[in-house]
Amino acid sequence: MDHGVSGDLIVTDGTTEVTRFKEVIEDDSIKRIVVNVSGGTDSPLVIYFLAKFISQTKKYDKEIFPHFMVDTGNMLTIAPTLVPKQIDVIRGLFPDVTIHDVYTQDFLRKEDWHDDLQRYIPVSKEGRHFRSDLYDDVESASLDGIKNLYCEPLKKNMWEVLKPDVLLNGKTSNLPNNTLKLYGADVSQPKARAAGETEKWPQEKKDRSPWYKVDKRFIGHQYRKENLMDNLFPLTESCLVESKGELIENGLKPDAYPCKMCHQCVEKFVAFGMYDKCWTK
């Protein structure tokens, strides 16, 4: 049984098969492939397999365009410096494939920004709801952790500038709730990605998300299988905490980043045995 990548462009862990890459590679009308990236582990793996399969099939007329919408109000993230390094690693592995420089667009969630504190603050301390979370259209946001209220015009601009034939992202299904609870994450976030919910997505959304029916454990398997733990994984960042003030509000020290408590930290640890910065505890 194949526990990695089969010869027919299908990514598998021996149980679940991901076929979206095969569809994109074999569709000769698709030349310009945009991948929304976030700095985490899932989206660079999409770029990695696209590049690998383009190289494998010698379909060099296909080009990859990474697109990154940067929340400038996140005071802790170093993802804007990590993402170009992720791309360089993949370019080094597949130098014959055209992977463009990251197309970056910035935004600030003005509804959530506190001028005096110089950071984002939630509307209510208990609910941890941000004002921009309260808009109805956030439910259909195409990037997790990105507030649709401010990203919608950026996405429209991306379509006009990059003119993609197909748009992909790195969304996965969340881990099962019982697994999350074992590690202290009581709520599956975002809820639309709770285990089993992604199967209910419309086909268009599934087509944008090659990993929609797998969770982070599948991603971890591929990193190990493809020998990406030493070169690509250390360049990923997943923690959702956005400021030292938020760390303190959660009872942590101001330098306790990654927090090891948020949904993304828990999922990363379950799948990889490590948090951001390759911390193991």
List each model region and its residues.
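Nucleotide-activated chemistry modules centered on ATP-dependent adenylation/adenylyltransferase
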Residues: 1-281
